[in-house]
Amino acid sequence: MALAPARTKYRKSQKGSRAGNAKRGNTLAFGEFGLQSLTRGPMTGQQIEAARVTISRHLKRKGKLWIRVFPHKPITKKPAEVRQGQGKGPVEFYIAQIRPGAVLFELAGVPATTAKEAFRLADAKLPFHCRFIAREGAVV
């Protein structure tokens, strides 16, 4: 099951602005190593889960993983071959709107080479470019 909010105040939302860089969540808060986005784009709950599974499988249940993003934004879609009008379509899935600089995942308790490889594998699952970052003083 993909990530989705348990409850929302409003069922549907407008597109909103995608401009600018990440002002919050752009530094390491928990772990020693992180995966930081370089470009913007939507990230679905399925993509978050796919990256999480990839990282945890590579780590073989060692270390600690933090997921720093959550899909709050509902995306609607009309069924195929439906005429225009009759309102907005039903919610299909949820996304996290990712901006450049946002830290997506953090790791601790593993060597830097292992973390770097795990994040490289996870980056392949994501729809935008990311980079590996390390905390000041962490042995890389």
Swiss-Prot record:
GO biological process, one term: translation
Keyword Hydrolase: no
Record keywords, A-Z: Ribonucleoprotein, Ribosomal protein, RNA-binding, rRNA-binding, tRNA-binding
Keyword Zinc-finger annotated: no
Start and end residues of each stretch annotated as Disordered: 1-24
Any one of the GO CC terms: cytosolic large ribosomal subunit
Gene Ontology MF term list: rRNA binding; structural constituent of ribosome; tRNA binding
Gene3D superfamilies: Ribosomal protein L10e/L16 (3.90.1170.10)
PROSITE patterns referenced in this protein's UniProt entry, alphabetically: RIBOSOMAL_L16_1
HAMAP family: Ribosomal_uL16
Subunit structure: Part of the 50S ribosomal subunit.
Function: Binds 23S rRNA and is also seen to make contacts with the A and possibly P site tRNAs.
Similarity comment: Belongs to the universal ribosomal protein uL16 family.
Protein name, entry field: Large ribosomal subunit protein uL16
Gene: rplP
